[in-house]
């Protein structure tokens, strides 16, 4: 990948992660667990579900903030360091993107078949309040193109790093 293309990818990813972080932080600052549970009806059924959901969102926020800060460092350097930038993009894929699509609390899941039809591909385990549904679906519309752009970092980047290590050993 050329340095120009890599830098452009870092800039685009930085912008998207910053947008995601702002949206998630705004939501988390406005809601409480008690408020979500009371808006949903049955407290016993929804308290654990929303607790997991909020925990996943807080983790996602931390991962995205860390990643966009590291991308910012990479982009501000006087000389663009390609290896560092690739490492950060790898971490974006494996922390931010994977944690969005595979949340630890399993509060929703992705149905990849729906993505090809142009429909929202997130399926919620329980009916959530409209604001949370809107946030999650909005995030998926930002994460989906980012995931496609960073697909290289799922497996090919690791293979490249392993080949480089083997060359240095030989």
Residue ranges of model-derived segments:
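Long, low-complexity or tandemly repetitive, helically biased scaffold regions used
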Residues: 1-170
